[in-house]
Amino acid sequence: RGLGDVYKRQAYAARKFGAPAIVVMPTTTPLLKVNRTKELGAEVVLHGNVYDEACEKAKELAAEHGYTFVHPFDDLEVATGQGSIAMEIVKELPTVDTILVPVGGGGLSTGVSTLAKMLNPKIKVIGVEPAGANCLQESLKAGHPVTLENVNTIADGTAVKTPGETIFPYLQENLDDVITIEDDELIVAFLDILENHKMLVENSGLLTVAALKHLKPEGKKVVSILSGGNMDIITLASVVQNGLIQRSRIFTVSVLLPDVPGQLNKVSKVIADVQGN
């Protein structure tokens, strides 16, 4: 799942058991995710530009104050819990051929791929990550976890430099493939899912929708896991605007006009004649 869901999950669990929670997030985290986590009773610390830097800060705070550090994805118990999604999929669709799962640090993909293969080894499980944060793809090529120099993607919930070291062997064994998605593809997928299915899914959760165009799903039973709907209004407006531009539904027109009355009226008539607005 996207990191926004991880933050909220840990804050909720801490409140449920009456324990204080400190959640460390990158400074680039959308305000919606920050506020939702605070609403669940957690103290939020903003540090670093990417998840990996925030994680190191959380480890420092845990060591300094004697807190219990809970890793958002590099933990087998966390991955096992997320793997229950595979159990739900197989229960509802026993004949599923392929499962597409978003990849950030690898917790969700570890759980889903491992549980799916245990239930039916013939199921293909494909991880999908942003092209600008393809740490798992590069790590699988290298045969060990590698750290990207930088990440650059609008899918902030999966913007991770290094996949989990503990869970990496499970990913090597159980993932059949990894597909990477460009930001432009995510923008188009966002518009598709919003207009055609009336669903608001954040960019990280849309990775598996965009991945469908990289496959040939005809005649196959393919499940795309949509994880996360944590998108603030400013990001939403920007993605919609860019999506409409890519779909050629919004144009920017620049013209040089004589400084005489009636010129704007002529431009408006030209636009109206082609059913523009």
Where are the regions that the model predicts?
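Residues at the starts of beta-strands that form the adenosine-phosphate
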Residues: 20-21, 43, 122-124, 221
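Alpha-helix C-terminal capping segments
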Residues: 8-20, 111-120, 210-218
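Small/polar-residue-rich loop-to-helix segments that shape phosphate-bearing ligand pockets
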Residues: 22-98, 129-180, 185-186
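Glycine-rich ThDP/TPP pyrophosphate-binding loop and its adjacent helix/strand module
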Residues: 89-122
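A conserved regulatory-domain signal marking ACT and ACT-like small-molecule sensing domains
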Residues: 236-277
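Active-site-adjacent helical/loop segments in soluble small-molecule enzymes
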Residues: 164-220
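Catalytic phosphate/nucleotide-handling subdomain of diverse soluble enzymes
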Residues: 213-242
